[in-house]
């Protein structure tokens, strides 16, 4: 057999042995941090190695459009103008590469513009910043970045709301950093800064990996179904401070927040992991490091006693001085392996259908 034929045969063999796999919606995130990257790579592979993704997503990823934004001059000088260039009813991935710098804009991505990616550089992350408040825009519309569309992704982006911290006296002082109301959204290595109501994790399936979220009160709130993996939750300010205010309203709702391999840090002490904003919140912390800033009771007492029987607050194999359970409120769920696995696998956010890694550009 000649060299040419051998080369062709080897090439064909490489094509046929390239793994094509379904992302596993069942395998839980491992307890050991060193194994998390392996789990992610095995279950959130690139498009070429995947089966079972939504057909619309597969079609959208076939020929991505890349556009550049630079405040100092480029294809677009503002992020708003770049987003305006995406047609309504968009059907293909649009990757907006953001140059380093500060973008003083109030940005909204409408529902009819799916498949948008905002991408910055990891060592010089662009900053989207605005100072909107509830008094001027209403709470959920005060965000510096509002995403209403599906299949959104953000990579290496900082989002801030620079409005002053609420003083307890000024009406309408809530000021969101971001509101995510679209379905199937992923955030990789992003940072969100605010005080009260930093992130409105509103509705839909969402995935946050290696992110940083800073705030004071209810700084992750809404009715989303979201997994936060390897994310730092940093609490600032003083007074009553609460991380999560999930807005579950009934036992039938499948939404909730899952914090996995996260780290709770902050200033002062007495921080609550969550509170019952509505009757049926669902919040789980797994493999999470809790520093001494966490209140020994863990969760805020319910103002409505009946909610003691309807909240679902789970803790699973967490660590650190803030994780001690001796003084936890009685409605804390010390969940077992079977129960925990629901919140530790991609099935919780339907990840096998839509979750992709950051683009390799």
UniProtKB/Swiss-Prot annotation:
Catalytic activity field? [(1->4)-alpha-D-galacturonosyl methyl ester](n) + n H2O = [(1->4)-alpha-D-galacturonosyl](n) + n methanol + n H(+)
Give EC number(s), comma-separated. 3.1.1.11
- GO terms for MF: pectinesterase activity
Q: Which EC main class describes this enzyme?
A: hydrolase
What would be the name of the gene that encodes this protein?
PPME1
The annotated pathway is: Glycan metabolism; pectin degradation; 2-dehydro-3-deoxy-D-gluconate from pectin: step 1/5
Q: Which UniProt keywords apply?
A: Aspartyl esterase, Cell wall, Cell wall biogenesis/degradation, Endoplasmic reticulum, Golgi apparatus, Hydrolase, Secreted, Signal
**Gene3D superfamilies in the cross-refs:** Single-stranded right-handed beta-helix, Pectin lyase-like
Miscellaneous comment in the UniProt entry for this protein: The pectin methylesterase activity is inhibited by PMEI2.
> What would be one Pfam family of this protein?
Pectinesterase
Question: What does the sequence similarity comment in the record state about its family?
Answer: Belongs to the pectinesterase family.
- Per its record, how is this protein called by name? Pectinesterase PPME1
What is this protein for, i.e. what is its function?
Answer: Acts in the modification of cell walls via demethylesterification of cell wall pectin. Involved in the pollen tube growth and determination of pollen tube morphology.
Q: Name one GO biological process term.
A: pectin catabolic process
User: Keyword Repeat on this protein?
Assistant: no
Instruction: Note the superkingdom of the native organism.
Output: Eukaryota
- Signal peptide per UniProt: 1-23
Where is it located?
Endoplasmic reticulum; Golgi apparatus; Secreted, Cell wall
Question: For binding substrate, which residues are annotated in this chain's numbering?
Answer: 174, 275, 277
Q: What happens when the gene is disrupted?
A: After germination, the pollen tube is sunted, curved and has an irregular morphology. No effect on the morphology of ungerminated pollen grains, on the efficiency of pollen germination, fertilization or seed production.
Q: Where is the active site?
A: 197, 218
Q: Which InterPro entries match?
A: Pectin_lyas_fold, Pectin_lyase_fold/virulence, Pectinesterase_cat
User: Has the keyword Ubl conjugation been applied to this entry?
Assistant: no
Give the main location. endoplasmic reticulum
Assembly behavior: Interacts with PMEI2, and in vitro with PMEI1.
């Amino acid at each position: 057999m000649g060299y040419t034929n051998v080369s062709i045969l080897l090439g064909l063999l490489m094509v046929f042995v390239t793994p094509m796999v379904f992302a596993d919606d069942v395998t839980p995130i491992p307890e050991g941090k060193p194994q998390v990257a392996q789990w992610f790579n095995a279950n959130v592979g690139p498009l070429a190695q995947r089966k079972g993704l939504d057909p619309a997503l597969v079609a959208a990823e076939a020929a991505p459009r890349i556009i550049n934004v630079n405040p100092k001059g480029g294809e677009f000088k503002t992020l708003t103008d770049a987003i305006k260039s995406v047609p309504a009813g968009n059907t293909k991935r649009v990757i907006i590469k953001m140059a380093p710098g500060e973008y003083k804009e109030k940005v909204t991505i409408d529902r009819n513009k799916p498949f948008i990616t905002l991408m910055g550089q990891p060592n010089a992350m662009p900053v989207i910043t605005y100072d909107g408040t509830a008094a001027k825009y209403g709470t959920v519309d005060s965000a510096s970045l509002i995403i209403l569309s599906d299949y959104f992704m953000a990579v290496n982006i900082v989002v801030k709301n620079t409005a002053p911290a609420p003083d307890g006296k000024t009406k309408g002082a809530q000021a969101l950093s971001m509101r995510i109301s679209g379905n199937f959204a992923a955030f990789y290595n992003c940072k969100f800064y605010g005080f009260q109501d930093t992130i409105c994790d509103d509705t839909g399936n969402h995935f946050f990996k290696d992110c940083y979220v800073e705030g004071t009160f209810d700084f992750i709130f809404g009715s989303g179904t979201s997994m936060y993996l390897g994310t730092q939750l940093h609490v600032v300010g003083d007074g009553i401070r609460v991380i999560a205010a999930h807005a579950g309203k009934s036992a039938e709702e499948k939404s909730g927040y899952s914090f996995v391999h996260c780290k709770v840090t902050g200033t002062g002490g007495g921080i609550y992991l969550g509170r019952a904003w509505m009757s049926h919140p669902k919040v789980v912390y797994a493999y999470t490091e809790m520093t001494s800033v966490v209140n020994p009771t863990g969760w805020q007492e319910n103002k409505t006693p009946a909610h003691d029987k309807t909240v679902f607050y789970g803790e699973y194999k967490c660590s650190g001085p803030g994780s001690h359970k001796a003084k936890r409120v009685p409605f804390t769920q010390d969940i077992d392996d079977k129960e925990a696995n629901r919140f530790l696998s991609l099935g919780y956010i339907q990840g096998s259908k839509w979750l992709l890694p950051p683009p390799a550009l």
